[in-house]
Each structure stands twice: as C-alpha cells, then as structure tokens.
C-alpha cells in the first residue's frame, strides 16, 4: 500500500509540474499570441483566448471580457497594443502597419465622398501640398519672389510698393503675401506680370 500511495504522489507531482510548465509557456492575458514573424507562444493562459486581429497580430483576450470596443478612428490593434481589439458597430479594425490598426467606418469609400468632405480635403490639400514658386518680373532689373498655395495665377499688378511686402492676388478665396527684394523701387506704370506654375 505504501508503494501505491508513493506512486500516486509522484504521479500527481509530475503532472502538476507538466501543467505548470505548459501554462507558463503560453501568453498571458492581453499578450501577443500570433502574427507574421511572431516567434513566441501561440497559446493563451487559461481564461483567455487567442483572437486574430490582422495578419501581423493576434492577442490573448479574456473569455469573460465585456469591456467596450474601440470607438470610431481609435486604435484597435498592433504590436504592444493593450486595448480593445474589437470596434463599435458600423466600423471595422483595419491594419495600418505592424504597430497600428484603427477602427474605420465600414461604409467609407475614398472615391465617393460627400461634397463637404471633398471641399474640406481640397482645402487641406491646397494649403499643404499645392505649393508653387511664383516669380514676378518686369522690365526693371529687380524681381520679387514668393511662395504661394494658389495652384496657378495670371494677373497684373500696377501700384507702387514702398514697404517690404504687400498682400495681393485674391483668387478663389486665397490670398498670398509677396515680398519685395528691392523696397526702394516702385512698380512701373506698365505693371508687373504675375504668373504662377
């Protein structure tokens, strides 16, 4: 009887060591459990499940997790991200790189946006990426250079300049400040031609 009792004790001890070793090799709650180039454990500790977010990232989420999903345009995944990986209704978690996924509305199609969104985008684009160099030339040897956000300008200015800069050329609601390189000269009476590229 002593032998059978000793055998059961050793067997129980061995099984508990094996299960502890297996559990310690699994990812903890909210830990990474999968993804391209991920070389860590792909199992999760008891009480959580490995949830796929995108090809680069899967995370151990508690089975009893009842927390809120990420709101529209919030982060919903990525390497070292420890937050909700689900998105509120009407949006989905879109992969934007290995470190960032974001909740994007399901019905957004970049090619068909509303007119107000289009004009907002156009306005932003005009101020940040449609920058061109404009040169004013005249028959006199001095020239004036400026940078403008107006895509193209063709106009004539025929007034005197006595300060170092002036505002002119209002086209489609945009105005630009042109800086003079020679402030002692006046504009010729025939005018300066302003062209933009």
UniProtKB/Swiss-Prot annotation:
Full protein name: Carbohydrate-binding domain-containing protein C2E1P3.05c
Superkingdom field: Eukaryota
Disulfide bond residue pairs: 33-50, 44-60, 76-93, 87-103
Region Disordered, annotated ranges: 115-163
Localization of this protein: Secreted
Residue stretches making up the CBM1 domain: 25-61, 68-104
Glycosylation sites: 182, 193
Organism: Schizosaccharomyces pombe (strain 972 / ATCC 24843) (Fission yeast)
Example GO BP: carbohydrate metabolic process
The keyword Signal is annotated on this UniProt entry: yes
UniProt keyword annotations, A-Z: Disulfide bond, Glycoprotein, Repeat, Secreted, Signal
GO MF annotation terms: cellulose binding
